[in-house]
Amino acid sequence: MASQPPQPPSGQPDTQYEEYQSEVITETTNRPTPAADVYEITPTNDVMDDRYEHEHDDYESGAMYETVRTWSPQSRPELVRIASVFSRIDSHPDVAPTTEDGGQLNRRDTLAGVKIGDPVLDPTKPEFDFYKWARMFTHVMEKEGIKRNRTGVMFRNLTVLGSGSAVQYQDTFLSPFAAPFRPGELCGKGRNPEKVILHDFNGAIREGELLMVLGRPGSGCSTFLKAICGELHGLQKKKESIIHYNGVSQHTFKKELRGEAVYSAEDEHHFPHLTVGQTLEFAAAARTPSKRVLGLSRKDFSTHLARVMMSVFGLSHTYNTKVGDDYVRGVSGGERKRVSIAEIALSGAPICCWDNSTRGLDSATALEFTKALKIGSQVGGITQCLAIYQASQAIYDIFDKVIVLYEGRQIFFGPTRIAKQYFEEMGWYCPPRQTTADFLTSVTNPKERIAKEGYENRVPRTAVEFERYWKQSQNNKLLLADMDRFEAEYPLEEGHLEKLRETHGQAQAKHTASKSPYRISVPMQVKLCTVRAYQRLWGDKSSTIATNISQIMMALIIGSLFFDTPQTTDGFFAKGSVIFFAILLNGLMSITEINGLCKATDPIVPNAQRPIVVKHVNFAFYHAYSEALAGIVADIPIKFLLALVFNIIIYFLGGLERSAAKFFIFFLFTFITILTMSAIFRTLAAATKTIPQALALAGVMILALVIYTGFTLQPSYMHPWFKWILYINPIAYAYEALLVNEVHGNRYRCATPIPPYGSGTNFACAVAGAVPGEMSVSGDAWVESSYDYSYAHIWRNLGILLGFLAFFYFVYLVVSELNLSSASSAEFLVFRRGHLPKNFQGSKDEEAAAGGVMHPNDPARLPPTNTNGAAGETAPGGSTVAVIPPQKDIFTWRNVTYDITIKGEPRRLLDNISGWVRPGTLTALMGVSGAGKTTLLDALAQRTTMGVITGDMLVNGRPLDSSFQRKTGYVQQQDLHLETTTVREALRFSADLRQPKSVSRKEKYEYVEDVIKMLSMEDFSEAVVGNPGEGLNVEQRKLLTIGVELAAKPQLLLFLDEPTSGLDSQSSWSIVTFLRKLADNGQAVLSTIHQPSGILFEQFDRLLFLAKGGRTVYFGDIGKNSETLLNYFETHGAEPCGPSENPAEYMLNIVGAGPSGKSKIDWPAVWKESEESRHVQQELDRIQSETSKRNEGHGQSAEKEPGEFAMPFTSQLYCVTTRVFQQYWRTPSYIWGKLLLGLTSALFIGFSFFLQNSSMAGLQNSLFSIFMLTTIFSSLVQQIMPRFVTQRDLFEVRERPSRAYSWKVFLLANIIVEIPYQILLGIIAWASLFYPTFGAHLSSERQGILLLYCVQFFIFASTFAQMIIAGLPDAETAGGIATTMFGLMVTFNGVLQKPNALPGFWRFMWRVSPITYTVGGLAATSLHSREVKCAQNELAIFDPPSGATCAQYLQKLVEAGAPGKLYNPMSTSQCQYCPLSSGDQFLGGSEIHWSDRWRNFGIGWAYIVFNIFATVALYYLIRVRKSSGRPNRIISVITYHLSQFGTYCRAFITGRKEKCPRKREQIGKIY
């Protein structure tokens, strides 16, 4: 029955409204001026530390002058400078006298009650006090007349619209074929309906106020914060929406003062190779004002502020530590979050919006962060809005105002102290010990809120009813009145804007536009970003050095390949090849500037650093084009040095002419080409949104650039439909210039005169450009005849290259500035077609789903009791959890110690930890940050892969066996799942492989359905996991992670690592209460817990609490209302816990958690000597004794199904292969990307080399067309490896430790699934390339052989990619190695340098290159028995002796077996001799023979088999043995000998004759 429209309660005291009205009037009418506001507001909040109140008292009463402490010689210069600034403050007229020893007593600042030299002002000292420092610094700024902007924000009728549906359908490989049958979707109808995200918000936030934003995930908190800062990016505000900042419209404010309102996103984006100090000093320098206290230098000012923020947020110890990311080792996740917070704080913005910035922080650190915000607001007048999950009461009390959101609707806005009363008067019940923030959020959750008795039919239920109630309330009327006063005080006019402009202009550097939002000029921005680029290079110098070394190695290889090239006509092709290689390698080495994979590890990768640049542009640190220009400037010297070394090697080693003038021209063109191609790749990366887009375009572009350089396809043989590419190809102009530069003015001895016995004018050289009767050929004539090149074009080409360079640099800078924002869209679920639940609604009525309003005495809401017999209790969703199998095993651990070695020094992470987990108990594992909670969990779950673990870990008194890991469930903190699978499929996969084979599949799937009901996942059981924002949300992913482990039916216990991390309080409550019910039904559970509220904490039975260093603080029962736990701490000297205080936060506080936390008591030592600790050891003895007796009674064969895995090898292979096939099928972007790459590349090659004639150049072009097909190899490999890594990450992080299936199954499944798609790709490439190139005249036998070779080549590519990536950590590293190996394979395949021209020491490479046999088989099949018809410029034309015919004159040559053919045998002049007569003769020069076609085909399959075996071997040696903790023998031996080699080399260099230790026993230890 629908409820009546809710009305505000009447007849009750309305004191809250009177207080609110009084407060509003006081704030608006008696508000102090900005200057007074800075110095008169005092920290009156109850949660502020007592020291702040004492400091304020000290300020009011004044204090006596004292002798100043001497500054430490180690103090940083900027701190001494700041101190000297403070010493000149005239806040008190008195000056202390001079002491007897001549030292002057400095003036004391009575404003903050500190003296110069006091360590409370030194951020490098532990005594540093941020509150005193902030008041002192603000006072100094005031005395110097330095202004800073202060502004509030008012929003009226704020409505934000987005596009997107609540549900989408998953695309598959066949989706493009089905699209024509869905015309509605094809035309876009209904695909992106307009969606209201925020509905008609109103509010005013005065300067210096803190606003807490509360709401469940998806309620619009992030959108609200973005709207306040004007960073909607794709979302739209309604025209009626008004947002202004003290009278300045948002449009004007964001245009001129962008950095004055900043938004801190939930995710962190930083350059991982920068240190914390460099990151924060950069932020401080970018926002350093032009006018600083008493002329402090920019460097001193920015460094000091960075140090202050590092001290405030507990980062001082990380100054020289890399920030890091998921791939680069650096600071911890919590510290990285604090770096983001400090970066925002250094922006100096008067309006800051923080989106869940306390995520990943423990409660003590979160409280410290909030206190710092409060100080910034009180002292600096900063207006701050913070969306926060799981806020403690102490955090809530710091805020001034709160806004509550419910499904995008505003249901409250006002002072924090009246919010709870507002909802209680509405009719909602707040349970004891529930924090106010949790209560306010819980009223928006139908499953959690509790109605007071008598209010069941009066309280609002839906979001619309809550909103209606709010708009009719007296609080809303007062708010609207306050907004009217705000607008009257700050009308929309230019007055306040001019004040903001004036203050902003005071902070701007010289030569900065007055209306620019930036504080520093463009040259200063470029300089700052350039310095940062070099810092990043230095931070990742190993990668930079490795890249440069690989380039130099390639130069050595290519140069040596053409070493000692003859200076004859036989060297023409080699000269063209080496110049082609040189210009190509120089030009394409910059392609790495695209492939950063969004990791920001490369300082020159635009796409990788885009999220960081977008953030910094929004903070008004710098223009995007300034960062782009800085990347160019920083890169030029590095490219110059690399180009110099590279080109010196390849030029002089490759046999090019040793002329200074020609070398410098060569170097000039190659260097300009490097810069031009770099500009092109940068532009391509900046113009695209994603890395795959950029790489796809780059692949096609590179193919076009290579083919139309002029070497692989000569200009005269280019077809008109693609010849235009030649004229826009920068490499083509460089190639022409280098080739004519090399041969200009030179004559080359003829190597093949026709006939060799000719004299006078009766012979000719068989090369283009030859003149009859001359034994040498002009280089200029050769290039003009062969390529239509001219030396006169050389400087013209330089001008064209410089034009290309300038054009693409300009476009790059423009695109970098314009192509920054990314569209925002609403979150949605993704379903497979035909599997959308019938009752699914985009925004369903949760009230109906919850079954009405809960009552205070509702059993579903009361904390569950710890009774193992409650088998029929219901989970939150109403379904039973009685399907949990009964458990009797007890897991114990005693004196567990974990030691690792870091940089050669031992470090103890866990120190003698003991405990146990019984069936039916829920045990919490807590501790301060860095205490080793996850480390202990990994150690107990047998998931560590390094270090030494000692101690006893037993199950029923027995040591752990090989089945332990598959009998336990481990819910990891990271929700790792395959993005293409559905929820039900993920659960079934776990059940299939981890439940014993004795259980039928039907029973397994029935149990999966029970798990789905237990976790209330029915509504999204057929939803695809997807990615965040496009798939399951955070809570749903966490439920799936738990469900996957439950589906395995863990027989022993369930481990959980931070199951509530990143969730809101209501979602956390759901998870923990579900764990409680699992424990009540007999499941043993051990869980680390993050920021638990008092109510959550009460759900646990026992607690294991750790201090830093992995030392035990407490292990034992928690007790009712935490009495047992609190009694222990209070008995041993801790202050009593307050009645309303959260016990979890209480414990963290007393042990000294948080950045500035300290404890006077050594709690681990107290525990070690306590009676409770001795009782733990006695209980462990008793458990072990009892279980040992039980074991003896049951014998030693309790294990019914021993073994590492639950299912046999064949079952594993079937399940895993099926899942990988599903993943590929449901990833059409990957499959179609692969197929389109092959199709477009093959068609482009085919029509570029369309039906080449039978001339010598035509045959060479046909061979090049086959060669160009092999260049697809690298792009294919780069596509395959990331897919392999995705599967491997999931396997190694979650599925292998759980013993779901074998690593051999993982490898075989991935190899098998790639093969069908590679076969299809081979068929497509065969049809697209060989028909356009050779026509349909080839016999069916030859066409079949070509098809077989194409299929084989693509299968080889997939197995090669898997071999390379198998043992390497990431796709980037493997990609670099694969590219190098591919370069060697194509270099030595006999096409670019004939095998007989290879130096002797490189000939073996021609034989081991797999491409040799692929090219050989394809070329032999295509060109066998093809007649050669020389073009006019290829003929040797000469006159026979007088009276002789051409046939008579050449009879001796023909009898000697010459391969050529005479075209006019009876002529007596102008004999035309073609050096070749058949394609087999042409191929013979490359040692390609028709008779070897099947041999080559067999060798190709041998390489494929080798790749498969090498994949297995490398994975085992590098990753399996490493993960098992056993030493890798081969790597150890290599490392040992390398280390001894280094010792011997050092001895040789220093002149000490030390013998290299080679004792057998030393090496034997390794084996």
Curated annotation (Swiss-Prot):
Subcellular location field: Cell membrane
General function of this protein: Pleiotropic ABC efflux transporter that may be involved in the modulation susceptibility to a wide range of unrelated cytotoxic compounds.
Glycosylation site list: 149, 157, 356, 819, 895, 912, 1253
Annotated membrane topology: Multi-pass membrane protein
SMART domains, per database record: AAA
Domain ABC transporter intervals: 167-432, 891-1134
Organism: Trichophyton tonsurans (strain CBS 112818)
Any one GO molecular function term: ATP binding
Region Disordered: start-end pairs: 1-37, 1172-1202
Top-level taxon of origin: Eukaryota
Keywords carried by this UniProt record: ATP-binding, Cell membrane, Glycoprotein, Membrane, Nucleotide-binding, Repeat, Transmembrane, Transmembrane helix, Transport
UniProt feature, compositional bias: Pro residues: 1-11
Induction of its expression: Expression is induced upon exposure to griseofulvin and itraconazole.
GO CC, alphabetical: plasma membrane
Name of the protein in its database record: ABC multidrug transporter MDR1
Sites where the protein binds ATP: 927-934
Residue ranges, compositional bias (Polar residues): 22-32
